């Protein structure tokens, strides 16, 4: 078996779905290993645009298995609506498999997410999808799993045990409205009935596929800088998008992973609150936002924009074990006379070349920029690295130098045919720095 993990190397929205869709052409299985329906993926298939949040990107290809791993949290209502949408658009979703160990987002999780966010004054900026409260219940051993949802008797038992606790929290702590047991039970038992045929022990399934020599892609959600352990805590998600999260969130041993592809936007974007050292609060940021259509797939919120941050990216390469890079949105930078890359931070007279954990330091960090000449040419139809304008080639070369990691692919537009591989992604040879 060969396994490739695809991770977002920044604060999410790097275009992971596009590279996963491209890699799918030579793979057999795609596994989502963390996150939930708070993370949107936009892919184009046969000139159609698909916006997915719950399902792995591979679901749009009938020749692949699309697996929701144990590390993902599942909103059954949202999942079924997404499945219905794909069916109505003529897609075959019979390749879907859902881990029986995946945890279920319940209506009280969504309510608690909104109430907590309101109480904090929107400090974290969650999507209010119930992701955080679901992961919290998982850690507190108060969660409901898919294996419970598809068994009406088991579901009744766990719901009867946990619902009073949640209602107490909602009403007494936040002054919210309590949930009725029978209403939730009737609704969610029906969801379980509809999803039952897709639910299985995906750990056993993936092991079987591995022994058969199948190629497996592990698809991360969000980005490494939002990782619960390694991101800009507390302005983070509730799971581990890092490469190591793929093994935990899929039930697959780390020895089954051969490569970790870090997807990098050619600049930086972020949604919500939190430190952002290279943020551009000026006309340059506005131009990049509009040219790159930088609005959230799920939230529709305008994304914050900044120059490429090599300090943050070095941190991502380190903690995620990134072996190769995929550079997206290179075309968005066409037309700029100069492009900047942050290579270090200045804080209180000191120079930092690593990404600090201390939020106060991050919030006061002043980027040390390296300026690179830009290019004016339209590159949206370029297919080979050597055919890019010289300055665009130099920009890619400098990214490789700063991160000490080779580029596997680059994209010059949003469509699959505008993403170009520089080598066989399944090859063990990683020495492609500046050679293509």
UniProtKB/Swiss-Prot annotation:
EC number: 6.3.4.4
Cellular component, GO, one term: cytoplasm
Binding-site residues, IMP: 13-16, 38-41, 127, 141, 222, 237, 301
Entries under Pfam families matching the protein: Adenylsucc_synt (PF00709)
Enzymatic reactions: IMP + L-aspartate + GTP = N(6)-(1,2-dicarboxyethyl)-AMP + GDP + phosphate + 2 H(+)
Keywords: Cytoplasm, GTP-binding, Ligase, Magnesium, Metal-binding, Nucleotide-binding, Purine biosynthesis
Binding positions (Mg(2+)): 13, 40
PROSITE patterns referenced in this protein's UniProt entry, alphabetically: ADENYLOSUCCIN_SYN_1, ADENYLOSUCCIN_SYN_2
MF terms in GO: adenylosuccinate synthase activity; GTP binding; magnesium ion binding
InterPro entries linked to this entry: Adenylosuccin_syn_GTP-bd, Adenylosuccin_syn_Lys_AS, Adenylosuccinate_synth_dom1, Adenylosuccinate_synth_dom2, Adenylosuccinate_synth_dom3, Adenylosuccinate_synthetase, P-loop_NTPase
Pathway(s) this gene product operates in, as recorded in its UniProt entry: Purine metabolism; AMP biosynthesis via de novo pathway; AMP from IMP: step 1/2
Subcellular location as annotated: Cytoplasm
Binding site for GTP: 12-18, 40-42, 303, 329-331, 411-413
Co-factor note (free text): Binds 1 Mg(2+) ion per subunit.
Record: active site: 13, 41
GO biological process: 'de novo' AMP biosynthetic process; IMP metabolic process
Alphabetized SMART domains for the sequence: Adenylsucc_synt (SM00788)
Positions annotated to bind substrate: 297-303
Names of the cofactor(s): Mg(2+)
HAMAP family, A to Z: Adenylosucc_synth
Function: Plays an important role in the de novo pathway of purine nucleotide biosynthesis. Catalyzes the first committed step in the biosynthesis of AMP from IMP.
Quaternary data: Homodimer.
Family according to the record: Belongs to the adenylosuccinate synthetase family.
Name of the protein described by the UniProt record: Adenylosuccinate synthetase
Organism whose genome encodes this protein: Oenococcus oeni (strain ATCC BAA-331 / PSU-1)
């Amino acid at each position: 078996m060969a396994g490739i993990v695809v991770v977002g190397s920044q604060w999410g929205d790097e275009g992971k779905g596009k590279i996963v869709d491209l890699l799918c052409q030579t793979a057999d299985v795609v596994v989502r290993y963390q996150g939930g329906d708070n993370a949107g993926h936009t892919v184009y298939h046969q000139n159609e645009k698909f916006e997915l949040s719950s399902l792995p990107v591979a679901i749009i290809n009938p020749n692949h298995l699309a697996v929701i791993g144990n590390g993902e949290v599942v909103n059954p209502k949202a999942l079924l609506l997404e499945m219905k949408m794909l069916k109505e658009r003529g897609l075959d979703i019979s390749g879907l498999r859902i881990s029986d160990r995946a945890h279920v987002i319940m209506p009280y999780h969504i309510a608690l997410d909104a109430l907590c966010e309101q109480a904090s004054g929107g400090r974290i900026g969650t999507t209010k999808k119930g992701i955080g409260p679901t992961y919290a219940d998982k850690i507190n051993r108060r969660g409901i799993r898919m294996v419970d949802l598809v068994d009406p008797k088991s579901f009744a038992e766990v719901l009867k045990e946990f619902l009073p606790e949640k209602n107490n929290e909602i009403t007494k702590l936040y002054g919210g409205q309590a949930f009725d047991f029978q209403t939730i039970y009737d609704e969610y038992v029906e969801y379980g009935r509809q999803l039952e045929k897709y639910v299985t022990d995906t750990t056993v399934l993936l092991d079987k596929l591995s022994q058969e020599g199948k190629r497996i892609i592990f698809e991360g959600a969000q980005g490494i800088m939002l990782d619960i352990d390694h991101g800009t805590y507390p302005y983070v998600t509730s799971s581990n998008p890092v490469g190591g999260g793929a093994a935990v969130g899929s039930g697959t041993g780390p020895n089954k992973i051969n490569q970790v592809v870090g997807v990098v936007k050619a600049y930086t974007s972020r949604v919500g609150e939190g430190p952002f050292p290279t943020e551009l609060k000026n006309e340059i940021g506005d131009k990049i936002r509009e040219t790159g259509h930088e609005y959230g797939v799920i939230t529709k919120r305008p994304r914050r924009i900044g120059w490429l941050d090599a300090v943050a990216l070095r941190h991502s390469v380190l903690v995620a074990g990134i072996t190769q890079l995929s550079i997206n949105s290179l075309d968005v930078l066409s037309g700029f006379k100069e492009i900047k890359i942050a290579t270090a931070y200045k804080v209180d007279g000191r120079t930092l070349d690593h990404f600090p954990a201390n939020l106060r330091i991050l919030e006061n960090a002043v980027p040390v920029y390296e300026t690179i000449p830009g290019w004016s040419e339209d590159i949206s139809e370029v297919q080979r690295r050597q055919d890019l304008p010289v300055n665009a080639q130099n920009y890619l070369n400098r990214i490789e130098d700063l991160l000490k990691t080779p580029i596997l692919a680059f994209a010059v537009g949003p469509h699959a045919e505008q993403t170009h591989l520089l080598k066989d992604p399944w090859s063990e040879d990683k020495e492609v720095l500046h050679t293509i």
